[in-house]
Regions:
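Short hydrophobic membrane-inserting helices
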Residues: 1-83, 87-90, 119, 128-135
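Intrinsically disordered, low-complexity polar regions and short flexible loop motifs
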Residues: 3, 15-20, 107-381
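Transmembrane signal-anchor/signal-peptide helices with a preference for the extracytoplasmic
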Residues: 83-109
Length: 381
């Protein structure tokens, strides 16, 4: 009988160890309480069994221990029933947790599928960007002595597409600002550089003929004069098929090295591009808030998105933000906390506040191990 007691005690110990490994570390406090209650029943069952074994060992007339059998049966039956109830409860709970894990895995797969679909659409948006422009080709005819005897200029249609569009956009925006800077130098009122940049971006985005080219801090007469001057520059550029591309600015040369008619606007291209890019970032961040992914995973997914953006795309994103069009980008820290400007070519930022200065407060709050805000460093070398 002593062997039976030892075996029973071993079962209790194994139950405790398994309960700890399977439930205490993994599941809720409710399960811990249930396991403690179950353990209490097992302890009671152990002492009941020990008492029964002692009675059987000391019995002289087994015909008189029938009441003990009834007693033991009365104790064991409900204990076994309770044990069975708890065992079934644990089984149902384990199944519930398993189903929950399956659901979470499905949600994770659904999220990844949607994210990579949005990533694919972003790449399509970039690849489908197109500007129909012009180019001038010079063909020379040589004689036998290799002297030029004839020069023929022909004009061809030039298509700028894909990421090259953003390269030209940066040139156009900077040139537009430099034209405004030169015009403002002789105007009766001197406007702040940031206001000139905001007006330049509106002209760049909507086109110089748009009624949306207006700014509260700049007089309408100045804006009308700017529009007239830009139309003249556009006509020279277009009539020369981009050969007339260097103009005199304020103590500098304005280099309008693009192959299409400048200052006609990019609203139809950039509007959709920025909306989709913003929606993709917002989608990832919202999934973090829902608890589906953590902050590190959000950064990893957005790093994949950012890797699809060229330096000029990030440069245009910064300009779009700094002049106010894209101010919502920083409401939830998309540019800083989630590092959407991490690869920004800081040295190419012209006429706007230095990004290191603009985001200085956030840079000072970065903790060790969180990584720099900018790939090129958060402190100017």
């Amino acid at each position: 009988m002593a062997l039976v007691a030892i075996i029973f005690l071993a079962i209790i110990i194994v139950s405790i160890i398994l309960g700890w490994g399977l439930f205490f570390k993994t599941y809720s406090k409710l399960l811990i309480a249930a396991l403690i209650l179950l353990l209490s029943f097992l302890v009671l069952l152990f002492f009941t069994t020990i008492h029964s074994i002692d009675v059987l060992d000391n019995a002289k007339d087994y015909s008189k221990i029938g009441p003990y059998g009834d007693y033991i049966g009365g104790i064991l039956n409900p204990l076994i029933a309770v044990f069975a109830v708890f065992a079934a409860g644990f089984a149902f709970y384990a199944q519930y947790e398993a189903n929950k894990q399956v659901q979470d895995q499905f949600k994770s797969q659904q999220f990844e599928s949607q994210f990579f679909e949005m990533l694919r659409l972003h790449k399509e948006n970039v690849n489908e960007m197109k500007i129909t422009g012009y180019d001038s080709v010079i063909q020379e005819t040589l004689d036998n002595e290799k002297k030029v005897v004839q020069i023929v200029r022909s004009h061809n249609t030039k298509i700028i597409e894909g990421r090259k569009v953003f390269v030209s956009m940066v040139v156009e925006l900077i040139s537009c600002y430099e034209f405004l800077e030169e015009i403002n130098s002789t105007w009766k009122v001197r406007y702040d550089p940031i206001d000139l940049l905001k007006l330049s971006y509106r002209i760049f985005f909507f086109g110089s003929n748009s009624e949306l080219v207006i700014l509260e801090k700049i007089d309408i007469d100045f804006i009308d004069h700017v529009k007239i001057q830009l139309r003249k520059h556009r006509k020279r550029h277009r009539d020369s098929y981009s050969r007339k591309n260097v103009y005199q600015g304020l103590n500098k040369k304005i280099e309008l090295f693009i192959k299409y008619s400048p200052f006609t606007g990019h609203e139809n291209r950039l509007g959709h591009y920025y909306r989709h890019l913003y929606s993709t970032v917002k989608y990832v961040v919202n999934k973090e808030r829902e608890g589906l992914i953590d902050y590190k995973q959000s950064r990893d997914y957005l790093k994949i998105l950012r890797s699809q953006m060229s330096n000029d795309e990030q440069l245009m994103l910064y300009y779009n933000y700094i002049i106010g069009f894209g101010k919502d980008w920083e409401n939830d820290g998309y540019l800083t906390k989630y590092r959407m400007l991490h690869n920004l070519p800081i040295d190419k930022v012209k006429y706007a506040e230095n990004p290191r200065v603009h985001f200085q407060e956030f840079i000072n709050s970065i903790k060790p191990g969180e990584g720099h805000l900018f790939e090129w460093g958060d402190v100017e070398q």
